[in-house]
């Protein structure tokens, strides 16, 4: 995310999308992430998420805030300079624009920062690949005629959780594992 200034002309990145929040801070949950021009990260989280944000966030300051749109007023206290966000929600972006009329919207700094992998990312990718390969093996052994996809999914999700993978329900994650179509589909 060091290239933010070059890419967007901004000093500060604000992550509201869960994938980018996680990538920026190590925390996956309901929160806003801020990366300032000095490379310091801050998480603004509601009361129920603060403890986990402190536990899971990597080198982050954690600030408690109310949930939802109220968190934007807390955000306003921390932003000085040119700001860029990854916000993909139209209503939230409109609210952000009211508070920060010159705020830019771009996912490019987040995407660019992911292009070059560091040692810890490579280690995580290798572990995830190994677990997914094992899950394909489980499918081959456990799948049988007449079985519902939801039954197979529960076996796979149990294995994934045992191996410290997590199901968030967000796109780009483990859920849904299964297509869930046809007469024996999960739906």
Which residues does each PLM region occupy?
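Alpha-helical structural signal in soluble globular domains
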Residues: 35-36, 95-99, 142, 155, ...
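Solvent-exposed, non-transmembrane amphipathic alpha-helical segments
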Residues: 33-35, 41-44, 145, 152, ...
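A composition/biophysics-driven feature that prefers long, compositionally simple stretches
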Residues: 1-137
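Secondary-structure boundary/capping motif
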Residues: 80-82, 144, 180
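Short, structural beta-strand-to-alpha-helix junction motif
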Residues: 70-71, 91-92, 144, 148-152
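Short catalytic-site patches enriched in acidic/histidine residues
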Residues: 21-27, 107-112, 116, 148-187
């Amino acid at each position: 995310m060091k290239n933010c200034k070059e890419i967007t002309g901004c000093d500060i990145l604000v992550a509201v999308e869960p994938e980018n929040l996680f990538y920026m801070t190590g925390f996956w949950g309901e929160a806003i992430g801020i990366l300032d021009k000095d490379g310091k990260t801050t998480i603004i989280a509601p009361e129920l998420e603060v403890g986990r944000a402190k536990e899971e966030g990597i080198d982050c300051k954690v600030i408690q805030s109310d949930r939802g749109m109220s968190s934007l007023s807390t955000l306003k206290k921390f932003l000085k300079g040119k700001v860029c966000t990854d916000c993909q929600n139209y209503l939230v972006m409109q609210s952000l624009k009211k508070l920060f009329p010159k705020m830019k919207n771009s996912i490019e700094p987040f995407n660019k920062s992911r292009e070059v992998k560091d040692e810890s990312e490579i280690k995580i990718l290798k572990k995830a690949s190994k677990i997914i390969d094992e899950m394909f093996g489980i499918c081959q052994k456990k799948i049988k005629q007449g079985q519902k996809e939801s039954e197979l999914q529960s076996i796979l999700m149990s294995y994934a959780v045992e191996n410290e993978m997590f199901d968030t329900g967000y796109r780009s994650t483990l859920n849904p594992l299964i297509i869930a179509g046809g007469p024996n589909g999960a739906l």
